[in-house]
């Protein structure tokens, strides 16, 4: 009995040590995930197991072999210290997540604090179990294509909708395995409990169906959502897409380049709107060329997997193809809002990949990118309902909720005021304000976008001032020359709004920028005068 307790205690100690400091090369990296994951997410359970082992040994009788009992006690103490540290780190994730959202460079989000936010639901933490929301309905195995794996499930509460927001979740599994019933459960349960409709598709897998089959199916599933989700209470205009690992890669690529003809599936025409409001990427593979500047020794293994099983083409000679399927290379100004969640101890996807993606996104896109970097956290941490999973789920729900609130077409009650604006528009040039048409001489044709009063809801002056500071910093990071503007209503029916004049910005980019800041419309100033354009389509109002 003593030797059994010794062996199990040694394994628990090794597992916890691997969770705290995993190997990152070769076989050590491969073993670090299955060995270290258990301790990282089940630290409380490991403490209970160790206590039971010591109790059993005490009941059975302490070993008579000299020094063996002392070794067992020393190992038990080590297991206790390691797992208490891991448990503290897991609960600390709540603070890490909150600070990540509140400290975002622009459009910061506040997470509400509560007793549950600090401690979690104790029985969920103990059991690592996320139950279905009460009354949840699951419509299983609905066909979205012809292949046997083109099946999806729809989760909803009976009273969801009409017009409920939708989350499309793509499972992971290295593009070669996985199932819609296996992953993302704690997050999806929380979304459904808050009135969302969740859609979980299967998709074709390599090596039987190599790239672009997985991506074609992901796009086909999104097209099904756009066409059919209204019959399940969802709003096709308020869709976010999420996924973990390979699913995070597919979700990111759907959000950034879902309309690319290279993977547009049969039967999905140009008339289908394939845009999404946000992407929630959990430990996603956001770089597909294996660049070791980001992968820190793991890139060779990625490229080997892609060459042999997924893409089934050598990287050499097909570099453009590999770059085209890399989300990091597809970031445009009109990219949707992103949440990037990544653990620093992930031995399958290095955390530097997420850092590089976020840096490039913030220098390229108008929408916000929220980056949650979790210390001492492995791949696939969100399989169980741990305190860490609870914290990141709250972040995902907050980001998704903000994204689906983004302004759409101009509401009818505002259209009349936009068509005949009584606004005096001024632009700041060389320290003085000049009229909108006078500024044409210096700037040429330009657009004016404001961050004030998002969704045309009057906002406190201090909040508008903060958003202007954030927008100025964001535009500077994008390398855009922005001049301050002021639009005032002589009748006094609407408060004055400040914003930025941008010369050389296309109408499409102006619309994307306006949407990213929650605006229904923007000004366009040309030699023909000042007009107001709809941010949803860029059409003149």
Residue ranges and their predicted role:
Residues 163-174:
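Short beta-strand element of the alpha/beta-hydrolase
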Residues 179-190, 199-238, 383-392:
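Catalytic nucleophile-loop/oxyanion-hole region of alpha/beta-hydrolase
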Residues 220-294:
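Primarily recognizes the serine-hydrolase "nucleophile elbow" in alpha/beta-hydrolase
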Residues 290-330:
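Mobile cap/lid helix-loop segments that gate and shape the active-site cleft of serine hydrolases
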Residues 334, 340-342, 346:
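Short beta-strand/loop motif that positions the catalytic acidic residue
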Residues 347-356:
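Conserved alpha/beta-hydrolase "acid-adjacent" motif
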Residues 387-407:
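Catalytic active-site module of serine/aspartate enzymes centered on a nucleophile-bearing elbow/loop
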């Amino acid at each position: 009995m003593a030797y059994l307790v010794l062996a199990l205690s040694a394994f628990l100690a090794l597992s916890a040590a691997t969770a705290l400091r995993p190997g990152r090369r070769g076989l050590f990296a491969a073993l670090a995930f299955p060995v270290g994951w258990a301790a990282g997410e089940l630290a409380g359970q490991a403490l209970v197991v160790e206590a039971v082992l010591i109790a059993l040994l005490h009941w059975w009788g302490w070993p008579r072999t000299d020094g063996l009992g002392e070794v067992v006690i020393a190992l038990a103490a080590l297991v206790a210290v390691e797992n208490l540290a891991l448990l503290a780190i897991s609960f600390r994730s709540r603070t890490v997540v909150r600070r990540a959202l509140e400290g975002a460079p622009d459009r910061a989000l506040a997470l509400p604090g509560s007793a549950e936010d600090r401690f979690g639901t104790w029985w969920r933490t103990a059991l690592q179990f996320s139950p279905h929301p009460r009354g949840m309905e699951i419509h299983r195995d609905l066909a979205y294509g012809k292949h046997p794996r083109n099946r999806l499930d729809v989760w909803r509460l009976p009273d969801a909708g009409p017009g409920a927001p939708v989350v499309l979740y793509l499972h992971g599994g290295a593009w070669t395995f996985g199932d819609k019933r296996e992953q993302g459960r704690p997050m999806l349960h929380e979304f459904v409990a808050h009135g969302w409709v969740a859609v979980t598709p299967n998709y074709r897998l390599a090596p039987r169906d190599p790239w672009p089959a997985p991506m074609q199916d992901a796009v086909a599933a999104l097209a099904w959502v756009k066409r059919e989700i209204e019959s399940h209470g969802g709003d096709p205009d308020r869709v976010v897409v999420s996924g973990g690992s390979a699913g995070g890669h597919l979700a990111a690529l759907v959000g950034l380049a879902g309309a690319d003809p290279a993977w547009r599936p049969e039967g999905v025409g140009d008339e289908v709107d394939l845009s999404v409001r946000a992407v929630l990427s959990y430990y996603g593979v956001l770089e597909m060329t294996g660049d070791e500047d980001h992968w820190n020794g793991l890139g060779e293994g990625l490229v080997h997997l892609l060459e042999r099983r997924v893409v089934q083409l050598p990287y050499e000679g097909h570099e453009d193809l590999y770059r085209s399927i890399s989300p990091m290379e597809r970031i445009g100004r009109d990219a949707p809002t992103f949440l990037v969640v990544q653990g620093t101890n992930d031995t399958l996807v290095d955390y530097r990949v997420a850092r590089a993606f976020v840096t490039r996104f913030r220098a390229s896109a108008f929408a916000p990118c929220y980056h949650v970097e979790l210390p001492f956290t492995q791949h696939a941490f969100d399989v169980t309902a741990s305190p860490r999973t609870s914290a990141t789920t709250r972040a995902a729900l907050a980001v998704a909720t903000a994204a689906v609130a983004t302004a759409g077409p101009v509401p009818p009650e505002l259209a009349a005021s936009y068509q005949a604006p009584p606004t005096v528009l001024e632009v700041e040039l060389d320290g003085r304000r000049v009229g909108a048409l006078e500024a044409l001489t210096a700037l040429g044709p330009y657009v004016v976008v404001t961050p004030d009063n998002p969704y045309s809801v009057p906002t406190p002056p201090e909040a508008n001032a903060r958003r202007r500071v954030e927008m100025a910093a964001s535009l500077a990071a994008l390398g855009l020359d922005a001049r301050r503007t002021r639009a005032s209503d002589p009748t006094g029916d609407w408060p004055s709004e400040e914003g930025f004049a941008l010369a050389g910005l296309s109408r499409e980019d102006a619309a994307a920028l306006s949407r990213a800041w929650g605006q229904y419309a923007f000004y366009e100033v040309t030699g023909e005068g000042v007009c107001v354009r709809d941010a949803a389509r860029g059409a003149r109002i």
